[in-house]
Amino acid sequence: MRVGFLGPAGTYSQEAVFAGPGTENYEPVPLPSVHDAVMAVHEGRVERALVPIENSLEGAVNATLDTLAFETEEVQIAGELVLPIHHCLIARDPVELDRIAAVTSHPQASGQCATFLRTRLPGATIVDAASTADAVRIVAEREGGEPWAALGSRAAAELYGCAVLASGVEDPPGSQTRFVWIAREAPDPGQGGTWKTALMFWEPSDDRAGWLVRCLAEFADRDVNLTRIESRPRRLGLGTYMFFVDCDGRADDPAVAQAISALRSHAEGVRVLGSFPAAP
């Protein structure tokens, strides 16, 4: 099975792909962005993709939400897993921290290490990279000039032959990233255990005071627990939003189905993004 992920080799996404059971038949396909990973499923270039959707420190991964919202309706969320994230400060060679001129990484990783960067590397310029592994690759290939460092995994440091200057630099320690599986087909409904349903909805142009409360009350009134809610701009101007919600249960469970049906009476649009087994 071809499995897309945010590349290059050495990213946390690649680590997450192989974190669960049954991975022996996976053919990993590194892709340049989260958007590309999702769209590779849409276009049939891979059967599945694993992409980050939220981090315990930095919150939602907007690229994932926006791609699902604006770019495709042909894929769905088919599973999830949670990966502990332990960032390292990495350089091509051992170097004193006060000599580092710049630190490069994915913006999510830089945000997760903001306190460390502010207190230990206050003079370093922060440079965005496409992924944590790409940041380590940049540092590994950089020759001459002032020393640069990257934020990434110990595995990436080993892969690119770099030195780990400090480990556990995320603030606070214990960061976790939730990843979701993207597929064209729904997971086997016969799987037992706890399930979740992800959906998105957006407000009508004539929304009135209390609109969002009424939407969410449809779940509370049926004792359906919401496990996540996020808002994103609809790109129609200031003050227009779409909302992403996860709830316990499957979309065809009676209480969940009734809540979604009632939600449609309030919202301009509702899309079920998928029902899937919850991570342990």
Where are these regions (language model features)?
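Domain-level signature for soluble enzymes in the chorismate/prephenate branch of the shikimate pathway
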Residues: 1-280
